[in-house]
């Protein structure tokens, strides 16, 4: 068992989640800004 390998895998999962979530977050932020006027 290699803790560094496990950490690397977890980091990649987190990065993938952030990358896939970023556009949605930006869209929601834009919509909120437009709604506020």
Curated annotation (Swiss-Prot):
Major localisation: secreted
Pfam family, one: Cecropin
Transmembrane segments: none
Entry keyword set: Amidation, Antibiotic, Antimicrobial, Immunity, Innate immunity, Secreted
GO cellular component: extracellular region
One GO process term, biological-process aspect: antibacterial humoral response
Statement: the UniProt record of this protein carries the keyword Secreted: yes
Cellular compartments annotated: Secreted
Residues recorded as bearing Glycine amide in the entry: 37
Family according to the record: Belongs to the cecropin family.
Function summary: Cecropins have lytic and antibacterial activity against several Gram-positive and Gram-negative bacteria.
Protein name in the entry: Bactericidin B-2
Organism: Manduca sexta (Tobacco hawkmoth)
Native organism taxonomy: Eukaryota, Metazoa, Ecdysozoa, Arthropoda, Hexapoda
